[in-house]
C-alpha cells in the first residue's frame, strides 16, 4: 500500500532506542507494533478487563523478562492502551529468581495446577515471534490464513528468515 520499506521490527526496546538515537532517518521504517510484552499488557487491560468486568485501574500487570531494557519500555510514550500503563512493573528473570530464593519457594513441593490461559487458545505465531524473521513469517502466515480461510499445515517461508538474499548498496 505504499508503506515505507524495508520494514524493520524488533522486540528489543534497547535496539529500538539505539535506532532512534543513531539512525533517526530510519525511524519511519520501524514497525508501529508494540513488543509482545506491551501487546499482552494492552490486551489484559482492554480485552481481558472488559470480558471480566474489571476496571483496568484495578489490574497490576507484571512482566518477567530477561532484559533490563524492558523496564525502560514500560515508561515510553504510547504504552497505555486503556489510559493506564499497559505494563505496570517489569522485573528481570534474575530478579524473579532472587525473589523465589528469598521467599524460600520450593517448586517441587508445590501442588500441580492447570495452565492459566486468560486469553484462550494461542497460535503458532507466538512461538516464532522472537526468532530472526519470525515477526514477518507470523504476519505472512496470518495473512494467508485470513485471506484463504484455511489453516496452514507445514508451510515454510524460508526467504523471510535470516540475511540471505539481502543486498547492500
Could you describe each region identified by the protein language model?
Residues 1-169:
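Iron-sulfur-associated redox domains of electron-transfer enzymes in respiratory
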